[in-house]
Amino acid sequence: MKIHEYQAKQLFRKYSIPVPEGLLCTNLQEVKTALKSLQLPIAVKAQIHAGGRGKGGGVKLGKTATEVVQYADDILGMSLVTAQTGPSGRTVSKILLEEGVSIARELYLSILVDRERACITIIACQDGGMNIEEVAASTPERIGKIHINPLIGPRSYHINQAREWLNIAQEQARAFSLFIHALYKLFLDYDCSMVEINPLIITEDNQLIALDAKVDTDSNALFRQRELQKMHDPAEDDPAEAEAAKFNLNYIKLSGNVGNMVNGAGLAMATMDIIKRAGAEPANFLDVGGSADAERIENGFRIILADTNVKAILINIFGGILRCDILAQGVVQAAAKVSLQVPVVIRMEGTNVKEGREILAKSGLSLINATDLNDAAEKISTLLTD
């Protein structure tokens, strides 16, 4: 789960991680009130769950009260488009006003779960304020990775490595060590998948301050994170993903043209590869799960069809706990309730596959059967090129 920058900084304050003084505002009256307690210049920062806000015009520095109010008026209610929002953008309903600070250097620092190495990794780079993915692609040698055994935690040599990567002076070693330990503790305490500071700044008087803050947490751990549950912002959820969650469907909306429905995350990933192989792009990730019933299949089908970008659908099921006849019943129910305007390719094997195929054959639906994954890829490719 993602939280807003202002919420991440609330957590930072709990762990004595330095952040600028700031106030959250949702309207111009609150902005005018905030100006009475904040010192100029003031940064006006849009609060949405996406990076690249500055490039999209969602972060402005006001040097006078008049400028701050004007920038706030411009940003509140705007549809902010960044590389992470897609062309439709996100509507800004909250802004963070923060006191400006004197910046001597901008750095990048993050702690994340490294799934390839099965450890926690500190990422350090001197190119702060930039898109770290762009730096990794163009100059990967500038990024330091310090791998930490989660059973042991960060040791002094780990922190020294990070400090050297960031070229932080020896005089700041103790402050930096306290900073890392606090950040790491926050990371563990809140079941985070990533904590990112971009930029981490060194001020002209040699203070370390988190100018920005991003905290992503493991949604599977939310049952024990009541504080984070309260930080969830439904307005930032994708409507289709929110609808899918009501039916316990693991759905992630993507930007492609082929919808897919699969049981099992691994098979879903393989199916997305097959779609790419066909020269198309997946429109979603949808794992209906092993215990799905006809109603859940129907709802998954309906959610896929609600995406106007979908030009074809690939259903790939290996019947086990989810029997093929149950899948077929769900598809038939869904087709009876929605207007099926796109071709559907079905590949299913496993438990009750014969019964499932009979149900589909008797339904009268114009469905395209595939014998295996390669056949499914060929049929999808043919459909999209005809």
Curated annotation (Swiss-Prot):
Molecular functions per Gene Ontology: ATP binding; magnesium ion binding; succinate-CoA ligase (ADP-forming) activity; succinate-CoA ligase (GDP-forming) activity
Q: Which residues bind Mg(2+)?
A: N198, D212
List, for all copies, the residue spans of the domain called ATP-grasp. Answer: 9-243
Q: Name one GO cellular component term.
A: succinate-CoA ligase complex
Cofactor section: Mg(2+)
A Pfam cross-reference name: Ligase_CoA
Coiled-coil ranges from the UniProt annotation: none
Tell me the keywords, alphabetical order. ATP-binding, Ligase, Magnesium, Metal-binding, Nucleotide-binding, Tricarboxylic acid cycle
Residues binding ATP, per UniProt: K45, G52, R53, G54, E98, V101, E106
The record's subunit annotation is: Heterotetramer of two alpha and two beta subunits.
As for family, the record states:
Belongs to the succinate/malate CoA ligase beta subunit family.
Q: What does this protein do?
A: Succinyl-CoA synthetase functions in the citric acid cycle (TCA), coupling the hydrolysis of succinyl-CoA to the synthesis of either ATP or GTP and thus represents the only step of substrate-level phosphorylation in the TCA. The beta subunit provides nucleotide specificity of the enzyme and binds the substrate succinate, while the binding sites for coenzyme A and phosphate are found in the alpha subunit.
Q: Which NCBIfam families match?
A: PRK00696.1, sucCoAbeta
Name of the protein: Succinate--CoA ligase [ADP-forming] subunit beta
Task: Record the organism.
Answer: Desulfotalea psychrophila (strain LSv54 / DSM 12343)
